[in-house]
Amino acid sequence: MPKLKTKSGAKKRFKVTATGKVMSAQRGKRHGMIKRTKKQIRQLRGTRAIFKTDGDNIKKYFLPNA
């Protein structure tokens, strides 16, 4: 059976760390920023770890070779 291909959209959105955690950018920074405080906008920078169960599903179905 051939290897599963990695989904190219997931390749751009998720990174798997050396310990196996799945990291992703924070949500909520595309539009509607005028109603957020400067502190809220600042705290949305960077990446966050995804919950373990969601991360396991991402690794299994979208990033099988990671």
Swiss-Prot record:
Residues 22-41 are annotated as: Disordered. Keywords: Ribonucleoprotein, Ribosomal protein. Pfam families: Ribosomal_L35p (PF01632). Disulfide bonds: none annotated. Gene3D superfamilies: 4.10.410.60. GO terms for biological process: translation. SUPFAM superfamilies: L35p-like. GO terms for molecular function: structural constituent of ribosome. PROSITE patterns: RIBOSOMAL_L35 (PS00936). Residues 27-41 have a biased composition (Basic residues). It comes from the Bacteria. The keyword Ribonucleoprotein applies. InterPro entries: Ribosomal_bL35, Ribosomal_bL35-like, Ribosomal_bL35_CS, Ribosomal_bL35_sf. GO terms for cellular component: cytosolic large ribosomal subunit. Transmembrane segments: none annotated. Belongs to the bacterial ribosomal protein bL35 family. This is Large ribosomal subunit protein bL35. It comes from Rhodopseudomonas palustris (strain ATCC BAA-98 / CGA009). The gene is rpmI.
